[in-house]
Swiss-Prot record:
Annotated organism of origin: Pseudomonas fluorescens (strain ATCC BAA-477 / NRRL B-23932 / Pf-5)
Listed name of the protein: NADPH-dependent 7-cyano-7-deazaguanine reductase
Top-level division of the source organism's lineage: Bacteria
Upper lineage: Bacteria, Pseudomonadati, Pseudomonadota, Gammaproteobacteria, Pseudomonadales
InterPro entries reported in the protein's UniProt record: GTP-CH-I_C/QueF, NADPH_dep_7-cyano-7-deazaG_red, QueF, QueF_N, QueF_type2
Subunit structure: Homodimer.
Pathway given in the UniProt record: tRNA modification; tRNA-queuosine biosynthesis
Active site: 184 (thioimide intermediate), 191 (proton donor)
Entry keyword annotation includes Translocase: no
Catalytic activity: 7-aminomethyl-7-carbaguanine + 2 NADP(+) = 7-cyano-7-deazaguanine + 2 NADPH + 3 H(+)
Amino acid sequence: MHPAAEHSPLGKSSEYVSTYTPSLLFPIPRAAKWAELGLSADTLPYKGVDYWNCFELSWLLPSGKPVVAIGEFSIPADSPNIIESKSFKLYLNSLNQTPFDDRATLEATLRTDLSAAAGKPVGVRIRSLQEVEAEGVVALPGVCIDDLDISVDSYEHPRPELLRCDASRVVEESVHSHLLKSNCPVTSQPDWGSVVVQYRGAALDHASLLAYLVSFRQHSDFHEQCVERIFLDLQRLLKPERLTVYARYVRRGGLDINPYRSTETADFANHRLVRQ
């Protein structure tokens, strides 16, 4: 467990505050998890963003009438802190009985508070239910590898030694899997996700990638670090010209987290999958 997470509200009984309380936000430094991967703030080999979607966003108009909407928040992958998920939820719940003059005022408030917690500017977008409904759900790009026949006997820790490639062939492709699963390092609750790998480099053996992804099944770590570990393991193996790894996780407590890591510009289309 991350030392800072021990002091967060995650996994503990909490009072649900219904009036605006920005102090509920609990930042967790990324540095410790970066260090586990041999990284530091100055040596990150990727660009990226953590995209959070909130489906339980509500506040009051000056008249007292409630409003509901969907919130989208983009936290830079190189920000000093992540925001602990339960504290994020408690903070958003604190808006429920709080009046705001208009949507722009609420967006500005969210931007200020979340940027202060993350340590870097956070993007905020509040969207109507009709707007998001019209977008529907999308399919992930590329080839789905989930029907490949593999044998698995280890689920406790990621096993990069399972990964194989053909260095004699250079390919450019996108592959994806819906079988990503890990556990919250604080509560041990399952985190279900789908992951996409897009790259140009030595041809990756798809069955070995699937076996590797399944090896995360009982691993305990935050969403962001799982994606960073996958990125680094593939980068070491493939030595690619370009590499992007991103995951879309199933929501919990009205929030879903979607980490994106890439050697290229962080151009992330935030479209929901069928499980979201």
